Amino acid sequence: MNTLTVTSDVKGAIKQLHFNLWDSTRNDLHFLDIGILCKNDNCNLKIHLPDSGITPDVEDLSSKFIDNIPNAIFNAPVEIAEKNKIRVFKIENNLRFILSPFDKKTSIKDKDSEINIAVERLLDSQNILVAEYRYYRFRIKNFDLSKVIIEVDSKSKSFESSFSSCKVIDFRVNDAKLLPVIESQKIISSADIFEKIHFLYMTDVNEDIQLADVNYTTRFLERDIWDDYLNLGKKKRFDMIAYHLRQENSFSANFLIKCTYNKTSKKHLVAYAGIVIVLAIVANHFPALLCWLFSLLKNLFIALCVRIAYLNISFRFESQT
């Protein structure tokens, strides 16, 4: 099963889904961030990851919502207010939400790569909703990228093909046809409509990207803002770019991206440098090598002619005697 599934036991509880797939070789970033915007009401959310046979290693990201990170995550101005010591965020269309921490001790199910979140209605001291929505954001640190990224080996044996490779990102959400029959029927029968499903693919700036969907946007990830969010510490961060696709008013989504990337390693460079040096030496000595080869062939030809003449004379002499 190479599709993620996100469902709720209360219809209409989930408003938006956010998926950020980080795939940067230069920065050694390979994981998935998930954001769920749901109603501030009692419900149970279930997230099922593509089968990998391991328990999800989840990191809560609510503590990262400081400084300019909220603006960077939503790529828009975010207004933050405090109500009864609870931070309330306001984004587009006056949508207000509170940030809810992810409790991995009670939310992760060891079997089937499943994550469960029990949402409880949060009221203020006057029994009034603090905000209409709640937002969960967490990271799957050990997400198996091979479930959504297909490496394509080139059949070309050309010299240029040794420097680059191709991969296809096939990211699917609630794709019923990839599920077992019983599970797919459950998904279809409880199908809900999400206002928006966002998918962002973060990768190195030197990768050449092709997208099947023309309705996408690109964005250069701001320097210095993301370091703490990505847990980079004092490591130098190489530039990255984000490709943003989205599906509106749908229960499922299929995002397809094809990219070509540089796969040259130090071993490749040393081998190629050696080949270039050998070719340069051969090219530099080619005239002398050609003269030597011509002289060798000429001497062999003369020797062959002498040998033939000798055999011919010997044959005639034997015939006369």
Task: Provide a role label for each language-model segment.
Residues M1-E132:
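N-terminal pre-first-transmembrane soluble regions of secretory-pathway and organelle membrane proteins
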Residues D228-L279:
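Cytosolic-side membrane-insertion boundary helix
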Residues F220-W226:
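Short N-terminal edge-element motif at the start of the domain
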Residues I91-E160, K234-E248:
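A surface-exposed beta-strand-loop module
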